[in-house]
C-alpha cells in the first residue's frame, strides 16, 4: 500500500520539531556512530601495521623479498633463466668470497657483485652514495663492516680487506662509494663490488670454482 502525502511541508516541520526536542539524544547518537567508525578504522590500521611489520621482519631475516631465488648458477644458466618469459623481473648476484681473520671472526661478511634490482630486493641499497661503477675499485658496504675496519662512513674513504676466494687468500683495497645501516636481523654483512672487479680478483686468484659457490651467479 502506498500513501500519497500532499502536505510535505507540514511533515517536514513536524520532523524538525521532533529533532529539536531530542537534540541531546541525536548528538549522542551521532557521536556514537562517529566514535564507532573511528574505532574500527583504528583497529584495521593497527592490524595492517602489525601484518606489514611481521612480513618485513620475515623478509629481512630471509635476506630478501623476491618471489623466488636460484643460487649458484653458471653464467649460461643465469642468462637462460633471465630470458624465460615467465620471469617478469630479475636481479643478479655474483659471489666472490668471505673474510675469516680479524676483525671478522665473529661476523659473517659476504663480498660479491649485485645489480640494482638485487640490491633493492635484498635491502642492500646505499642510503648514502651509490652502488659501485664498473671498471673501478669502488665498493659499497654496510656500516658494521666499516666499523669493524675502523673506517668512518665517508664517501671516498679507502679501506683494505683480506678475504678468502675459493681457498685462496687475497688482500684488496677499495674506495667507498656508498653505505647503508646494517639490519640486526639480516643473516649476513655485505661488501658490494662491480662485476669487473669481481672478475679481476677471480682471475688473479686462479679461480677454479671448486667450492660450487665462488664465482657463480644467483638470480
Report the location of each language-model feature.
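Generic secondary-structure boundary/loop-capping signal
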Residues: 11, 37, 41, 121-124, ...
Amino acid at each position: 500500500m502506498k500513501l500519497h502525502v500532499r502536505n510535505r511541508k507540514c511533515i517536514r516541520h513536524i520532523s524538525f520539531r521532533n529533532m529539536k526536542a531530542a537534540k541531546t539524544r541525536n548528538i549522542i547518537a551521532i557521536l556514537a556512530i562517529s566514535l564507532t567508525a573511528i574505532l574500527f578504522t583504528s583497529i584495521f590500521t593497527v592490524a595492517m601495521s602489525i601484518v606489514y611489520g611481521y612480513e618485513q621482519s620475515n623478509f629481512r631475516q630471509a635476506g630478501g623479498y623476491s618471489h623466488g631465488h636460484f643460487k649458484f648458477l653458471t653464467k649460461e644458466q643465469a642468462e637462460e633463466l633471465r630470458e624465460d618469459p615467465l620471469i617478469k623481473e630479475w636481479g643478479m648476484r655474483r659471489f666472490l668470497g668471505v673474510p675469516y681473520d680479524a676483525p671478522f671472526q665473529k661476523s659473517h661478511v659476504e663480498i660479491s657483485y649485485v645489480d640494482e634490482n638485487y640490491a633493492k630486493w635484498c635491502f642492500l641499497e646505499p642510503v648514502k652514495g651509490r652502488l659501485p661503477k664498473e671498471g673501478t675499485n669502488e665498493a659499497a658496504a654496510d656500516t658494521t663492516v666499516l666499523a669493524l675496519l675502523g673506517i668512518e662512513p665517508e664517501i671516498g674513504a679507502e679501506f683494505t680487506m683480506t678475504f678468502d676466494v675459493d681457498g685462496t687468500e687475497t688482500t684488496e683495497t677499495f674506495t667507498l662509494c656508498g653505505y647503508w645501516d646494517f639490519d640486526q636481523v639480516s643473516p649476513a654483512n655485505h661488501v658490494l663490488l662491480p662485476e669487473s672487479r669481481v672478475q679481476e680478483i677471480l682471475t688473479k686468484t686462479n679461480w677454479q670454482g671448486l667450492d660450487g659457490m665462488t664465482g657463480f651467479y644467483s638470480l
